[in-house]
Amino acid sequence: MTFEKKTVVDQFKVHATDTGSSEVQIAILTTRIKYLSDHFKKFPKDFASRVGFLKMIGQRRQLLDYLKKYNKDSYSSLIKRLYLRK
């Protein structure tokens, strides 16, 4: 998972030392959400992890709303790059 995190940060960073911009945070959360989606297909009764999963989805939604409000160009390009619905 840490290797994937580094590659995601490298793909979505805004500047050379970027690790915490909204774009990077959304990309990292999306990667973790996709991983957990596959996990829940294998283990449908893992309810404890599902709580954290739903929190991650809510956090990503808040970050997407923030990005949409303050930087629409970045929001639209990020949605396309991550294949998310609007």
Curated annotation (Swiss-Prot):
Q: Which CDD domains match?
A: Ribosomal_S15p_S13e
Which UniProt keywords are given for this protein, alphabetically ordered? Answer: Ribonucleoprotein, Ribosomal protein, RNA-binding, rRNA-binding
Alphabetized SMART domains for the sequence: Ribosomal_S15
User: Is-annotated flag, keyword NADP?
Assistant: no
Coiled coil, from the record: none
Asked if the Swiss-Prot or TrEMBL record annotates the protein with the keyword Transcription, the reply is: no
What SUPFAM superfamilies does UniProt report for this protein, alphabetically?
Answer: S15/NS1 RNA-binding domain
Gene Ontology biological process terms in this record: translation
Entry's Gene Ontology molecular function annotations: rRNA binding; structural constituent of ribosome
- Gene Ontology terms: cellular component: cytosolic small ribosomal subunit
Q: Which Gene3D superfamilies match?
A: 6.10.250.3130, S15/NS1, RNA-binding
One family from Pfam that matches here is Ribosomal_S15
**PROSITE patterns (alphabetical):** RIBOSOMAL_S15 (PS00362)
Subunit info here reads: Part of the 30S ribosomal subunit. Forms a bridge to the 50S subunit in the 70S ribosome, contacting the 23S rRNA.
Family statement:
Belongs to the universal ribosomal protein uS15 family.
Q: What does this protein do?
A: One of the primary rRNA binding proteins, it binds directly to 16S rRNA where it helps nucleate assembly of the platform of the 30S subunit by binding and bridging several RNA helices of the 16S rRNA.
Name used for this protein in its record: Small ribosomal subunit protein uS15
Q: Which organism encodes this protein?
A: Endomicrobium trichonymphae
State which gene encodes it.
rpsO
